[in-house]
Amino acid sequence: MEVENSRKRQLDSRPQQHLVNGGSPSKRPRLSNGYESTNGADAATDPMELDNHGDNNHAYPSPLEGEQAPTPTPRTDGPEQGTQVDKVQELATETTFLRLMPDDTTSTASNPQDGAAATTTAATGAASPSPANGENAPILLRCEWNPKDPSILAAAGTDALARIWTISRSSTMTPAPDSESDGHVHGVHRPYHSLMDDETPKSATVGQLAWNWGGTAIAIAAEYGDKASIHIWAKDGSHVDKFDVSDPPVIKLRWSPSDAALLAIAPDNSNGNGNGGALVTVYHSLTSATLSYFLPNHDLLNWPLDAAWTSETEFLLTGGDVMLSLRCTDTAILPNRKFESRDDDTFTQVAYDWRSKLAATSSDKGILDLWDENGQRRSITAHSGAITALQWQPLPADSSPPEDERLIATGGDDCAILIWNAKFPDQKPKSYFTMESPIVAVSFTPDGAFIAGATAGHILIWKVGEHTMPRASWSRAPHPGWLSPKANSEPEEEDEHCLCWDADGQRLAYGANSRLAVINFSR
């Protein structure tokens, strides 16, 4: 009982930003999707059956226009080619589930003298979907593919979960000898590098991780009791550096554009009353020098801060009614500019686009704001509820996009995903998609050609510019393939969801609670 209470305290102490950026709001009305089926969701019997709904003509309306999302229609490619009906690719059979439980019987300890992480190889025997110690399965909080190497995936969470796997595309299609597998879903044990040193207790929570832009190193933030630390590891699992943090938890990690500095946001309780404010620290990875900026009297619990680098020395800081530009000198972090905010602003996320020099902020009131270099602000009422996801469309470095177009996607509690042209924010969205429940994450492929949207139990993938019908669909359902088993006391509601593409845009990682799926996608 004490162990379980400790785990609950770990989760309850996490900052509430997770509820905004990746939350799964409870008791939302389940609304129809533009991708319809004649089978009701409640009647699903196949383990990976689509979370479809009946043909009820209740597609969720556009937040701006009040129109129904179009149902799938025939697509005409030309008068001589005739009419073709697009087929949605079902990804259930292209799924691998990674085990998150520690394999104590086969793991090898780290060597503290050479700083190398432990390499753990799971047993080759059949895996039980519900082992005796399943109730202690870690809760997944973060997952992220290496931005340059499509075979490397990292994950972090409670119970000292911090590891990286090397997973080739072909290996994800090799099923484990699970007697309960139906042949459609592959549960696998994969060797991994643990990113925890011997000094970190097994009860630690790793709440943040971030690959650098070059994919050569990964930073993680671990907390245990009243202590916290940031570790930097090379992608081969060797330890590079460590920074102690005065007060846990670290709620954000952001690498600078050249990977020379790492920004971290954490509370500051040095005044002893528990509400001192927020501390922004920049660690220089090459020199181990640190710079700090204190934001007094900021309620970090209710209004978590987010940050985005705009150059190698400048970054934006936002959260609640705060919108600041800060600048790093050789000796300090100094205010660069304070943007004009309103009393009712409730900023939750910030994302900067170096191509257009525009910064985008989202709010829990559904407002998307676009800020130019001069601090001019243009606001869009994007959603009827909180914006839960925000991402600029990535483009290949050598591409030449149209001068009059720069796309950004938002997802919201209102079950809608919209793609906007930031160059013309007064216009209607370029595309909008709807799903059956609140959006918990959106993710563009690295080349910007496709976008995935996720709810708590369903993923749809669209080709950007084609919003009539999704290209692919994946649904989550109870199945032995979730090798990290559901704990008896694990809550049905989930605060954390991970969704990200590999560097090639051919595999999605999707995580929730104690489960992590790798989903193959064929373009």
Report the location of each language-model feature.
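Per-blade loop-tip surfaces of WD-repeat and WD-like beta-propellers in eukaryotic adaptors/scaffolds
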Residues: 90-93, 125-126, 164-196, 224-242, ...
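Structural hallmark of WD40 beta-propellers
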Residues: 150-154, 215-221, 240-241, 260-265, ...
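Conserved strand-to-loop turn within each blade of WD40 beta-propeller repeats
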Residues: 156-159, 221-226, 266-269, 275-276, ...
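Blade-level signature of beta-propeller repeat domains, shared across WD40, Kelch, NHL, RCC1
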Residues: 495-523
